[in-house]
Amino acid sequence: MDRAQKEQVVEELGQIFDASGVVVVARYEGMTVAEMQDLRAQMRDAGGSVRVAKNRLAKIALDGKPCASIADYLTGMTVLAFSDDPVAAAKVADKYAKGNDKFVILGGAMGDTALDPAGVKAVAQMPSREELIASIVACIGAPASNIAGAIGAPASNIAGILATLEEREAA
């Protein structure tokens, strides 16, 4: 890899570190190509990406970035998992690590907050942005549906009583 290619890699990684909501660093030593492709596919489905880069170039790209705290984890065979959604990459990495002993989470960063492996696991257990929005909408909509039910209930009760009275008169 010549100098121009290295500069391009550093630039790309810098853009990734700036744009990502979360970055997870993991060791992938011993993983097969098929396993790595499976990880990439799962991450892509969740809206994230996986990138293998030279640690030295990644450390240069981290200089001055909010997630610079992950530089300490960049030793050995490491892979970077990242996503715009603050929890997507952590969720996929945590799930994949549970099913594959060769994939070991070393740590990560969420913005300027450093995460150890337990921190990445905690982020992975958080609900996603879509799940949070759905629960907020449900909370907002619940009072309205309760009011509609309360308003409609007396009318249905009266209709039931009238139907019962009609049946008694007919009998």
From Swiss-Prot:
Domain of life assignment: Bacteria
Function according to Swiss-Prot or TrEMBL: Forms part of the ribosomal stalk, playing a central role in the interaction of the ribosome with GTP-bound translation factors.
Gene for this chain: rplJ
A Gene Ontology term for the protein's cellular component: large ribosomal subunit
Similarity comment text for this entry: Belongs to the universal ribosomal protein uL10 family.
The entry's keywords: Ribonucleoprotein, Ribosomal protein, RNA-binding, rRNA-binding
Quaternary structure and partners: Part of the ribosomal stalk of the 50S ribosomal subunit. The N-terminus interacts with L11 and the large rRNA to form the base of the stalk. The C-terminus forms an elongated spine to which L12 dimers bind in a sequential fashion forming a multimeric L10(L12)X complex.
InterPro entries the UniProt entry points to: Ribosomal_uL10 (IPR001790), Ribosomal_uL10-like_sf (IPR043141), Ribosomal_uL10_bac (IPR022973), Ribosomal_uL10_bac_type (IPR047865), Ribosomal_uL10_CS_bac (IPR002363)
Protein name per UniProt: Large ribosomal subunit protein uL10
One annotated GO molecular function: large ribosomal subunit rRNA binding
GO terms (BP aspect): translation
